[in-house]
Amino acid sequence: MPKHSTKCLLPSLPWRGSLAHRIPRRRRAKMSDTYPPSSDFVSNAHVDAAKYDEMYARSISDPEGFWADEAQRLDWMARPTRIKNTSFEFGRVDIKWFEDGVLNVAYNCVDRHLKTRANQTAIIFEPDNPEDPAQHITYAELYDKVNRMANVLLSQGVMRGDRVVIYLPMIPEAAYAMLACARIGAIHSIVFAGFSPDALANRINDCGAKIVITADTAPRGGRKTALKSNTDAALLHCSDKVRCLVVKHTGDQTSWIQGRDVDLNYLMEHAAPDCPPRPMNAEDPLFILYTSGSTGKPKGVVHAS
């Protein structure tokens, strides 16, 4: 699938003239002030200004050496020897990074932290209701959930290279799903939970998804979006072979189609807690993210591992 670029257009403003004319002079002055970071903040920075300038200069003068060193920060199953392979000739644009390297993104995000950070927080989930307590999910818990979801996907016939559309609110299961796909070599595509059934159907069909992961409803700002109902409407325009994995997030009642819809909570609870990470080439597709469509039909941008 080709890589595309798009530009972001700001929405037209409901007033004419400069925005500054609408802001009181005193507030305008404050908006133009600069705020230097505190000495404590500066002392704890991973990279200070001088080091940044040094790194940037080397990245320009010796890009292969610079990125070869940066690649050492990752855990590789096979370390790359070919770092940068690019061509910008007209009609022959080709960009490859670490093309003979082998790794697994999920392993780098989760597994390698278990030795020293198993009980540290990996994800903080803030529920929509401000009165509900935040959830702190440790690396050990994240590892368990990701492995279980990976095994669920395998049980549903998802294989290396298959596409999985994720149509979820910002809940932990969204992170589990992305990492589970990376673990088994499936390609995920996030669809914003505020998108319409038509937009969802277009993306499912365009990438040829085998699975859609959604939730019953998505609470936001005191309101609920019926994600499962939207998914039902979208799948009317998709192949009848697409399966639907449903996260019971709010517990709201939803329609259910036997043979197509699957209770993801139940399957994860009963799935095996271990799934070995698949070796993936650095240039293997990791995810597909669709452009806004401001220049026509949304285009799938493929991001490599």
Regions found by a protein language model. Name each.
Residues I60-R82, D100-I124, E283:
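A short N-terminal helical cap/helix-turn-helix that marks the beginning
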Residues M31-I95:
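N-terminal amphipathic, basic-rich helices that act as targeting or association modules
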